[in-house]
């Protein structure tokens, strides 16, 4: 059965190395194990899409081109196009409610204030999908707005720590693919 892996982030080079795009970066890292996989634009599905075959089955990775807050439009379109059941959807998203480097895998989880997650839940009419939440922490100073923080570039320290985050995310992703995860 086909699996849908949704990376949340914003399109455009100016956002590539921002905290809000850690989902896009994580998808790129996960796809390194599939050298044949290349993201290609699928305008009618509002996404860049990469398809791979694995021992666990077919996988469709998407990077919505709708910007974070409207991610649900792309997820809903791709889900319908490929006929993917909601419990075979995994969303890779940044999480300000957990310290940088903390990674959690959950099903039926709330959005924690994440507007992209909220958009996906609204578009699908359910939160019965899986989330791989990638901790980015919160601003260290009170004078920094949360929106500026998530759209900000990674610090040098975060750039070093992101590799450990990706290793943990990859392990949880493998568990999810094989069905050995716990909710």
UniProtKB/Swiss-Prot annotation:
PROSITE patterns attached to this UniProt entry: PEPT_TRNA_HYDROL_1
Pfam families for this protein: Pept_tRNA_hydro
Organism expressing this protein natively: Chlamydia caviae (strain ATCC VR-813 / DSM 19441 / 03DC25 / GPIC) (Chlamydophila caviae)
E.C. no: 3.1.1.29
Xref: InterPro entries: Pept_tRNA_hydro, Pept_tRNA_hydro_CS, Pept_tRNA_hydro_sf
Annotated active site: 20 (proton acceptor)
Single GO cellular component term: cytoplasm
Gene: pth
Site (Stabilizes the basic form of H active site to accept a proton): 94
One BP annotation, GO: protein quality control for misfolded or incompletely synthesized proteins
Domain of life: Bacteria
Primary subcellular site in the record, as a coarse category: cytoplasm
Catalytic activity: an N-acyl-L-alpha-aminoacyl-tRNA + H2O = an N-acyl-L-amino acid + a tRNA + H(+)
Stretch forming the signal peptide: none
This protein's name: Peptidyl-tRNA hydrolase
Family: Belongs to the PTH family.
Any one GO molecular-function label of the UniProt entry: tRNA binding
């Amino acid at each position: 059965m086909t699996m849908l892996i949704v990376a949340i982030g914003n399109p455009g080079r100016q956002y590539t190395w921002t905290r809000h795009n850690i989902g896009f970066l994580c998808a790129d890292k996960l796809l390194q194990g599939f050298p044949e996989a290349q993201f290609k634009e699928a305008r009618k599905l509002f996404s860049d899409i990469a398809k791979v075959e694995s021992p666990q089955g077919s996988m469709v990775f998407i990077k919505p081109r709708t910007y974070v807050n409207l991610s649900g439009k792309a997820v809903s379109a791709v889900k319908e196009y490929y006929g993917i059941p909601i419990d075979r959807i995994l969303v890779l998203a940044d999480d300000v409610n957990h310290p940088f480097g903390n990674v959690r895998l959950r099903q039926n989880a709330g959005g924690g204030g994440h507007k992209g997650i909220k958009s996906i839940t609204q578009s699908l009419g359910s939160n019965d999908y899986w989330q791989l939440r990638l901790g980015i922490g919160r601003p260290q100073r009170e004078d920094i707005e949360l929106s500026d923080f998530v759209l900000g570039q990674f610090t040098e320290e975060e750039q070093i720590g992101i590799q450990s985050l990706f290793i943990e995310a990859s392990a949880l992703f493998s568990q999810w693919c094989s069905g050995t995860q716990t909710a």
